[in-house]
UniProtKB/Swiss-Prot annotation:
May act as a sequence specific transcriptional activator. This is Transcription factor Spi-B-like. GO terms for cellular component: nucleus. It comes from Paleosuchus palpebrosus. Residues 127-160 are annotated as: Disordered.
């Protein structure tokens, strides 16, 4: 017990007796000083797992690679989604170039297992004839590839002018008629009438060929080159033969004897 002396107190006060525990109670009633939180020392965390990063890494023992189990490819089932699954052959190597995506849809029926038929080589066009159309006399006769090949002769190869009116007009008949009537003299004329030699004009020969095409009713335009081939084909049967002169031909003797050509007036 503590006794307060009267001399320490101002004025007449009675003396009081306090126990030791009373002072401890008074200390608990003192206000504690307040400090900003930024100046206060941070208390260490009380979480026992907070320092797990500071633990030393345990040592690992060496392992044998043969103990590893081989990996197997696992096929993941494709679920319903907006995009179809990528095929297995669409995985490309990083070393090679990536193929460009195709933006054009390809119909499956455009490709088949049967290969396409190869086209036969196109024949090269023959060398065009010169303007004079000079054929060597010893050259073989040319085959007619146009509609002049339908000019058939009577049986035995003889000429039958009587039945010619009932048949299709032939080229030699067309030319012989022009020379006898004197038509288109600027295109064709007699050189030696008695021998049956006639000549075409180098300037108007195409006009004569065009007239012959219209006479036959051909859809394609007739050219002098085609008409000259038909004239060469007559060399097989003897109606017309080529003379060693440019654009000059001669009727056969049989044709001249049967038709009886007369000199132009």
């Amino acid at each position: 017990m503590l006794t307060l002396e009267a001399s320490q107190l101002d004025g007449p006060h009675p003396s009081y007796m306090f126990s030791d525990s009373s002072f401890y109670d008074l200390d608990s009633c003192k206000p504690l000083p307040t400090f900003p939180h930024c100046l206060m020392e941070a208390e260490p965390p009380t979480d026992p797992c907070a320092g797990w990063l500071e633990l030393a890494e345990p040592g690992y023992e060496p392992f044998d690679s043969g103990q590893l189990a081989p990996l197997h490819t696992v096929t993941v089932p494709y679920g319903h989604g907006p995009y179809p699954p990528a095929p297995s052959d669409a995985i490309y190597s990083l070393e090679g170039p990536l193929p460009a995506p195709s933006h054009c849809p390809v119909l499956p029926e455009e490709y088949g297992a049967q290969p396409y038929t190869l086209y036969s080589p196109c024949p090269l066009p023959s060398t065009p004839l010169s303007e004079d159309d000079d054929f060597p006399t010893d050259a073989p006769a040319l085959e007619v590839s146009d509609s002049d090949s339908d000019e058939n002769l009577s049986p035995g190869g003889s000429l039958d002018l009587d039945s010619g009116s009932r048949r299709k007009l032939r080229l030699y008949q067309f030319l012989l008629g022009l020379l006898q009537r004197g038509d288109m003299q600027e295109c064709v004329w007699w050189v030696e009438h008695d021998s049956g030699v006639f000549q075409f004009s180098s300037k108007h020969k195409e006009a004569l060929a065009h007239r012959w095409g219209q006479q036959k009713g051909n859809r394609k335009a007739m050219t002098y080159q085609k008409m000259a081939r038909a004239l060469r084909n007559y060399g097989k049967t003897g109606e017309i033969r080529k003379v060693k002169k440019k654009l000059t031909y001669q009727f056969g003797h049989k044709l001249l004897g049967l038709s009886g050509p007369r000199a132009p007036s």
